[in-house]
């Protein structure tokens, strides 16, 4: 666990962000967007806001994907105070009222960045390292697919290689800032014992894997 405000290399652990609700209502009171029905509907790390807004101003705050007109994009604003919504391009075209009521019920507070780790000790101290990120909501390929694969790898090793030759380390963390936090504590140990590592990401598609050689 890393407290808000902790310096990790030249980064700072940010405040914890929590969301209770977010929606857009038209002038008749009908919800045309509801975070509780689609977790991708909000720009993550949005500041709280609650007000009536003109359509011309609202559409400036709505994110969509031109290439996938029926898809709702995943958008974040971790390093800039902002707010916004996400919806499909085709849904955006159907907005036909002059005014809308928006509500983003969020808060920021001092909290913790948490990392999950599982270590399987082998006969040899040399480690095979696996890492995946857990910060993307409601998306199967990016990145529930990799979380599922990593969990099943742990299960497979426990059931079939109880006395493995190599040691295995599995890490679950928030993307980028989580990796930086982890390395700030474990880099020396990893440099000493890690033989090779796998970063698991988007394993639900048919793309090829990529190989990155060590600078050493």
Mark where each language-model region is.
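N-terminal hydrophobic/helix-forming segments and targeting peptides
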Residues: 1-216
